[in-house]
Amino acid sequence: MKKLFRRTVDTGIEHGTVTVLLGRDGYEVTTYRIDGAYEDSRHPKEVLFTNRLEEDLRRRDFTINAMAYNDEVRLVDVFGGMQDLNHHLIRCVGDPRERFSEDALRILRAVRFSAQLNFPIEEETAEAVRELAPTLENISAERIQAAVSYTHLRAHET
């Protein structure tokens, strides 16, 4: 990305993320990646870069966030995100316990998306939310406050 665009900011270069500046706007662009093991219920211990889109999509939180588009293939939806979007459903990619164990803040994201979009949470995903909610205690109060504040601000946008 840094070779394609003149103005970029290394916003998370260790995770393959740069912000491309176009005019007054910034767009985060992230290299396809595979997350290593999670040890703190928040961040992967290591990040491996890949050139396979499906591997990158597999690490996403919810099926509706695990879709991509390109001019050749058009919609890339290997996890049923469009079906869940059409059925107004929040569902984890793969095993919800694994997704929430990787990053406990995803629990709050599930609740936020459900409230914001008025989508129910799929039963297995909801069960994992209830089961793993105590893992939020491992997340700093500042991160939880930021997530809750973001949810509150977004609620007033609709």
What are these regions (language model features)?
Residues 1-157:
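Catalytic cores of the polymerase beta-like nucleotidyltransferase superfamily
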